[in-house]
Structure formats: structure tokens, C-alpha cells
UniProtKB/Swiss-Prot annotation:
Source organism (scientific name): Halalkalibacterium halodurans (strain ATCC BAA-125 / DSM 18197 / FERM 7344 / JCM 9153 / C-125) (Bacillus halodurans)
GO cellular component: cytoplasm
Known function: Acts as an anti-CsrA protein, binds CsrA and prevents it from repressing translation of its target genes, one of which is flagellin. Binds to flagellin and participates in the assembly of the flagellum.
Family, similarity comment: Belongs to the FliW family.
A GO BP annotation: bacterial-type flagellum assembly
Localization per record: Cytoplasm
Subunit-level organization: Interacts with translational regulator CsrA and flagellin(s).
Keyword Chaperone listed: yes
Keyword Membrane in record: no
Protein name: Flagellar assembly factor FliW
Highest rank taxon of the organism: Bacteria
């Protein structure tokens, strides 16, 4: 067990097998190499991706398919190798939220999903270069806003 201080839940004991290694960090947070996935609030679709090193670094994330069933992510071979993915059922995809006031104006980044190999506890933020998905998609808008034409 590892004791960590969290932004939203205070001090927690976390099993070692729940720690997720981000070997390259997350863009703009390259020194942050270890996170834990926590429910944000019981009974909601929101999670916290909490740094185990920095208390105030906690991203609010969601499963984008819960909000946008037509959303698609094709993992590049390099990501499959980097995260040691051998079974697609081991892959979890999440998207970062930008929480706004009022909450109904919150946006989700569909252009750079968080990809986690749940079996190996390895993750990365994948920047989709060849996509029409927006990085500021309104979360509660049913239709996807396409930022640009896909190449």
C-alpha cells in the first residue's frame, strides 16, 4: 500500500497495483510519472486522475464513449507497443475535462485521450494528430463538433 495525499479526497491508502505509470508524463507535466484513477464522486461518470507526487495535480476525466458513443480512437502501433497492449479489452480510454462555471458549459478534450493499459497499469496521453475531433467539445452537446476536416 502507498499513502498519497489527494486534491479532492484527502489522504488515501492506495494498493500498488492501482498505480498507473506514465513513463513520459503527460504533456506539460512530463515530470509526473505516476497517477492513480479514483472515482470523483460515487454514482457519477466522473473520475480523478490524481498524481501520486503532486497533491494539486488531479485531472477530472470521463469515459468519452458514455457521452459520445460515435467517438472513435485508433491506437497507433507505437502506442500499442509502448503500453504493451496485447488485448484490446485491457484498454481504457478517458478524456480530460475543462470544468467551467456553470458546469453545463464544461468541455472535454477529444483530441488527446488518456489511454490506459489496465492490465499492465501503464498509461499515456495520446495526441491524435490526424483527427477532426475538438479539444474543447462541449460535454453536454449531443453532436460532436468537428474542429477541422480529418486528413
Amino acid at each position: 500500500m502507498k499513502v498519497i495525499e489527494t486534491k479532492y479526497n484527502g489522504k488515501l491508502e492506495v494498493a500498488e497495483d492501482r498505480l498507473i505509470a506514465f513513463d513520459q508524463g503527460i504533456p506539460a507535466f512530463e515530470d509526473e510519472k505516476e497517477f492513480v484513477l479514483l472515482p470523483f464522486e460515487e454514482g457519477t461518470p466522473y473520475y480523478t486522475l490524481q498524481s501520486t507526487k503532486t497533491v494539486d495535480l488531479a485531472f477530472i476525466i470521463v469515459n468519452p464513449f458514455s457521452f459520445f458513443p460515435e467517438y472513435r480512437v485508433k491506437l497507433p502501433e507505437a502506442t500499442i507497443v509502448q503500453l504493451n497492449i496485447t488485448n484490446e479489452n485491457d484498454v481504457a480510454i478517458f478524456s480530460l475535462l475543462t470544468v467551467k462555471e456553470p458546469f453545463s458549459e464544461t468541455t472535454v478534450n477529444l483530441q488527446a485521450p488518456i489511454v490506459i493499459n489496465a492490465n499492465k497499469q501503464m498509461g499515456k496521453q495520446l495526441v491524435l494528430g490526424d483527427t477532426a475531433y475538438d479539444r474543447k467539445q462541449p460535454l453536454f452537446q449531443k453532436e460532436l463538433v468537428l474542429a477541422k476536416e480529418a486528413k
